[in-house]
């Protein structure tokens, strides 16, 4: 029942506006590609948003503190053209690997990534979960397992009709 659920909305990758810590920020062509494909520019100022791979450590912490029971993943289609998709599953701090969100994230966090195969498929025309490529399903399953939270809805484009409900078990 929707009234018994707390939905968390996330992107298939991470963005940040303004300064501050962003462990998975990409300063290379990959970051630029995500920014361009995701139209990650400020609506008023046109300022570039900072882009990076999904940070599952930070997301898991956010899910916990907000009591999220189900997730909605937006902008899945932005990752359609990548050979490899990365997801931060831990951080290295002073040479030690940790899988929790530390008290002080101001500096010294190095992301530890899991790499998954990209789906290299245009998902924008898909209308049901049955059409999703195997690699995309593997990415979603990986995220669900890492986050211990089901992803119930995914978007495969900016239009309302490009929002697909998944038939996951609760």
Language-model-detected regions and their locations in the chain:
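Non-transmembrane, aqueous-exposed alpha-helical and coiled segments at domain scale
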Residues: 3-170
């Amino acid at each position: 029942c929707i009234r018994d659920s707390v939905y968390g909305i996330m992107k298939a990758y991470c963005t940040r506006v303004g300064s501050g810590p962003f462990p998975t920020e990409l300063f290379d062509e990959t970051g630029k590609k995500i920014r361009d494909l995701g139209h990650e520019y400020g609506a008023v100022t046109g300022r570039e948003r900072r882009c990076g791979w999904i940070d599952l450590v930070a997301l898991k912490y956010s899910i916990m503190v907000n009591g999220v029971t189900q997730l909605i993943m937006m902008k899945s289609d932005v990752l359609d053209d990548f050979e490899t998709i990365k997801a931060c599953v831990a951080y290295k701090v002073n040479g030690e690997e940790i899988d929790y969100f530390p008290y002080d994230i101001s500096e010294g966090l190095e992301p530890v990534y899991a790499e998954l195969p990209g789906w290299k498929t245009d998902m924008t025309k898909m209308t049901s979960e049955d059409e999703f490529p195997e690699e995309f399903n593997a990415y979603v399953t990986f995220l669900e397992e890492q986050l211990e939270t089901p992803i119930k809805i995914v978007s495969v484009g900016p239009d309302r009709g490009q929002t697909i409900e998944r038939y996951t078990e609760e």
